[in-house]
Design a protein with these regions (language model features):
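Flavin-dependent oxidoreductase catalytic cores
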Residues: 1-313
Length: 313
């Protein structure tokens, strides 16, 4: 089974990808990392700072798949061409993001409101794709039954892979992923299918592999931030040790401090990781409030040392 790290804005950036690969990468279970979405500029002028995340030199030894968030097929096709010139083979199209600020612009899962517009978008992309294109999607806007018409559109095109998150746009991340709907639509998919949604434990991975052996892959998001060793454990490897987690944390923290130029900005980014990661530490729940209140580097470092003193769980 192929394992993929889901794109998560503010979490799975180049610094995290490098740290995760270094500390928890498993040769027997190589991970493909999907980068957080990039929106192509309407004036077709690339912003160097935004593109720096995807520079091959910034991602050595890591297999990265760039993801596009767009509603203009011609503009997306142009951006795919730019990414191919950077050396990327596969490019992923985001029709899954449920954020209101995204869908209000008709992007992400907002594209699923109108299958005809979705069809026109994909037609423009594939008429000049020049290589593999994959899609990440939800089942629809309000009802899982909408996916029949949406899937008819996807099946018209040679997608190299279709990643399905079996929720609808209006759910955001509430409720449970609809695996019954996923199972019902899976046989009708002509592209290789990857599953994404509510995968947080090794048991979840094994259950999916047993239920759907035909899957091309499984994509893990929040579960991998909460347990960086999750995919290593899935192939029989060890759980994360205290020393590994400390090295992983320090690489992230120092990497963000160097990138942002000040520890206080790095602290803000690290809090997003600790929201998930803290549950690996026994009794550390009591330190969540002091962690949230920390602003300066020294305050943050003091709390983090206390958290690591709580190991093991």
């Amino acid at each position: 089974m192929n394992y993929y790290a889901a794109p998560m804005e503010g979490l799975t950036d180049r610094i995290w990808r490098q740290a995760h690969q270094r500390w928890f990468g498993a040769p027997e279970a190589p991970v493909r990392y999907y980068a957080p979405f990039l929106s192509p500029p309407e004036n077709r002028v690339l912003i160097k700072k935004k593109m720096a995340e995807l520079e091959p030199a910034a991602n050595p030894g890591v297999q990265v798949i760039p993801q596009l968030l767009a509603k203009d097929g011609e503009l997306a096709a142009w951006m795919i061409g730019e990414l191919r010139r950077m050396g990327y083979t596969e490019v992923n199209l985001n029709f899954g993001c449920p954020s209101g600020t995204v869908t209000a612009k008709g992007k992400g899962s907002g594209m699923l409101r109108d299958p005809q517009k979705l069809d026109a978008f994909l037609d423009a992309v594939f008429s000049q794709a020049g290589g593999p294109v994959s899609v990440k999607t939800r089942l629809g806007v309000a009802r899982a039954e909408e996916f029949g018409e949406i899937l008819d559109v996807y099946n018209k095109y040679p997608l190299c892979e279709l990643t399905i998150h079996p929720r609808v746009m209006k759910q955001l991340y509430r409720g449970q992923a609809d695996r019954e709907a996923f199972a019902a639509y899976l046989p009708a998919c002509t592209a290789p299918v990857c599953y994404n949604g509510d995968v947080t434990t090794v048991d979840d991975l094994r259950a999916l592999e047993a239920a759907f052996p035909e899957l091309s892959g499984i994509m893990v998001g929040r579960g991998l931030i909460a347990d960086p060793a999750l995919l290593r454990k899935a192939v029989g490897g060890l759980a994360a040790s205290r020393e590994e987690l400390r090295g992983y944390h320090d690489e992230l923290y120092h990497g963000y401090t160097e990138t942002f130029g000040m520890a206080s900005c790095a602290v803000s980014r690290m809090k997003a990781h600790w929201f998930y990661l803290i549950h690996l530490f026994d009794g550390a729940d009591a330190l969540e409030k002091p962690l949230r209140k920390a602003r300066e580097g020294w305050e943050y470092e003091t709390v983090v040392n206390q958290i690591f003193a709580c190991w093991p769980k």
